[in-house]
Amino acid sequence: MNRLLQRQLFLENLLVGVNSTFHQMQKHSINTCCRSLQRILDHLILLQTIHSPVFRLDRMQLRQMQTLACLWIHRRNHDLQVTLGAIKWISP
């Protein structure tokens, strides 16, 4: 299985598993490090999609999937280095 397919399957499975939890979380329950992580994500997604018309159309979906994935990873680790490694792995 190639890396792209592996990443896609990971994100799809994660999205299904975490979507309801994500929507139940209240804004104030996401702590400061998770909010910082979301800012990093927004910046990464912007950099990755700014020159690509195809990705521009998918930016919102990509942002939702990456945010879900990274919040899920981060809430279980609370280790920023591990989380940044995971972001690199799931980023296009």
UniProtKB/Swiss-Prot annotation:
GO terms for cellular component: host cell mitochondrion. The keyword Cytoplasm does not apply. It holds the Pfam family Rota_NS6. It comes from the Viruses. Keywords: Host cytoplasm, Host mitochondrion. Interacts with NSP2 and NSP5. Belongs to the rotavirus A NSP6 family. This is Non-structural protein 6.
